[in-house]
């Protein structure tokens, strides 16, 4: 897999992958805009033919300029179990620490064992503290056919450059 920043043309692929992975899906427009405006803080994993097998989207928090917020991680079903999510996270970690950022944050539902393990291994291997705190409660989300689970904030850092 080749890791690189996304291009505008990747927006539709990120949308489809998010849908297929069962992530909270945003509009195709949002993913396309993301690939334009936040390409420098995101990554896509491409197979030999250029197809998108995974992505990480994130941004530098405007009110906390030393903190990267990881918004979504998606890995195609055929590429799971091969360490691709961790490889993309390491890629982002190297990029943000190289830019002088000290913290990585994300939100995770309490039942998402895979994401919790991913962030725990990242923090451990980087020798960085990891802290979990409640952030969004069910009441913060609109009620629909399925109630949205709460989201806890994971904060990792400070990260060494």
What label would you give each PLM region?
Residues 126-161:
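C-terminal "cap" of GNAT-fold acetyltransferases
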Residues 1-14:
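A short beta-loop-alpha structural element at the N-terminal edge
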Residues 51-61, 67-69, 74:
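Conserved beta-strand in the GNAT
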Residues 72-80, 108-109:
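A short, internal acetyl-CoA/4′-phosphopantetheine-binding micro-motif in the GNAT/acyltransferase core
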Residues 96-110:
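Conserved GNAT acetyl-CoA-binding A-motif
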Residues 86, 110-132:
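Conserved active-site alpha-helix within GNAT-family acetyltransferase domains
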Residues 75, 81-94, 117, 121:
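Conserved acetyl-CoA-binding loop-helix of GNAT-fold acetyltransferases
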Residues 19-48, 52, 57:
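Active-site rim helix/loop that mediates acceptor-substrate recognition in acyltransferases
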């Amino acid at each position: 897999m080749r890791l690189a920043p996304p291009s505008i043309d990747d927006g539709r692929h990120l949308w489809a992958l998010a849908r297929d992975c069962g992530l909270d899906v945003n509009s195709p427009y949002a993913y396309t805009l993301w690939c334009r405006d936040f390409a420098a803080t995101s990554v896509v994993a491409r197979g030999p033919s250029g197809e998108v097998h995974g992505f990480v989207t994130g941004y530098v928090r405007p009110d906390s300029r030393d903190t990267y917020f990881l918004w979504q991680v998606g890995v195609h079903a055929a590429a799971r179990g091969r360490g691709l999510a961790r490889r993309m996270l390491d890629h982002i970690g190297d990029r943000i620490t190289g830019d002088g950022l000290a913290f990585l944050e994300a939100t995770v539902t309490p039942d998402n064992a895979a994401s919790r393990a991913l962030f725990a291994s990242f923090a451990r291997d980087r020798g960085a503290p990891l802290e979990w705190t409640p952030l969004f409660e069910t009441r913060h989300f609109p009620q629909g056919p399925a109630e949205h689970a709460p989201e806890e904030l994971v904060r990792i850092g400070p990260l060494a450059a």
